[in-house]
Amino acid sequence: MSNNSLETLIAVETDARNFGFEWQNREMIIDQAISECEEIREAIHKQETDARIQEEIGDLLHAAISLCIFAGYDVEQTLEKISTKFANRMSALKKITQARGLTNLK
């Protein structure tokens, strides 16, 4: 997702909330995210088109971003934190792998 796409989604989400189209609580958004996961699984199971699967993944991303905004977190900062967290995990995993004489997990 490019920053422009992310910024656009955040702007549309904010506009929707200002218009009164908003979630009532976090649980509703979590339920929506779970529903989107189920729709992704179903689309894959039914061997639907890549475009359809991508659309469902986009819906899941939207739900996650909605939850972030609803909870009052800065989306960019949240993404930066998870990027750092994942990079640190990968660094540790690579060190363990190298210590075992391997170059990768394949």
Regions found by a protein language model. Give the residues of each.
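Flexible "arm" and connector segments at domain edges
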Residues: M1-I57, L61-K106
